[in-house]
């Protein structure tokens, strides 16, 4: 124990530096441990990068996919704006285009309309996925038509809109896929 005796007004005071020494030693030890951990992590990362580790290959692939999807966003924005302008032209003087109708796409029916706010095609959604596609058993299928009408009557509160909303919720906009009801609707009218 390191002691220092101080005399002040005939009073002897002993100052013990033992706790200060322990604190300094703890600081030195923790600093050394910190730098050893950082050095070990750096060496591990260097080893991962110099070896053909599948973790970094997967991360590289993920970054490429993420950048590609970000590029799609600008394309989808442009296409959504074009389709919205086209929808405004289609809706001029036609108020019934904003009401759900069963649209015949050949092999299936979809209950769809133009959205009043965005003027984009909108369909009744099946759960959390894409639109209800009521498959037809024959060229003329009254039961499929009837089920489509049932969807309009009872399920019209759950909808999906082509474009950015669909891209954000499902991962695709519907415009750049063929066949898809969004791109087919654009070609129908």
Swiss-Prot record:
Record key words, sorted: Disulfide bond, Fusion of virus membrane with host cell membrane, Fusion of virus membrane with host membrane, Host endoplasmic reticulum, Host membrane, Late protein, Membrane, Signal-anchor, Transmembrane, Transmembrane helix, Viral envelope protein, Viral penetration into host cytoplasm, Virion, Virus entry into host cell
Keyword Membrane set for record: yes
InterPro entries, sorted: Pox_LP_H2
Membrane topology, Intravirion segments: 1-28
GO cellular component, as recorded: host cell endoplasmic reticulum membrane; membrane; viral envelope; virion membrane
Transmembrane portions of the chain: 29-49
Source superkingdom: Viruses
Keyword check for Transmembrane helix: yes
Subcellular localization, as worded in the UniProt entry: Virion membrane; Host endoplasmic reticulum membrane
Pfam family, one: Pox_LP_H2
Gene Ontology BP terms: fusion of virus membrane with host plasma membrane; symbiont entry into host cell
Intervals, Virion surface compartment: 50-189
Lipid bilayer topology: Single-pass type III membrane protein
Posttranslational modification: Contains two intramolecular disulfide bonds. They are created by the viral disulfide bond formation pathway, a poxvirus-specific pathway that operates on the cytoplasmic side of the MV membranes.
Function: Envelope protein part of the entry-fusion complex responsible for the virus membrane fusion with host cell membrane during virus entry. Also plays a role in cell-cell fusion (syncytium formation).
Subunit structure: Part of a stable entry-fusion complex (EFC) which is at least composed of proteins OPG143, OPG147, OPG155, OPG86, OPG94, OPG107, OPG104, and OPG099. Formation of the viral membrane is necessary for the assembly of the complex.
Family stated for the protein in its record: Belongs to the orthopoxvirus OPG107 family.
Protein name per its UniProtKB record: Protein H2
Organism (species): Vaccinia virus (strain Copenhagen)
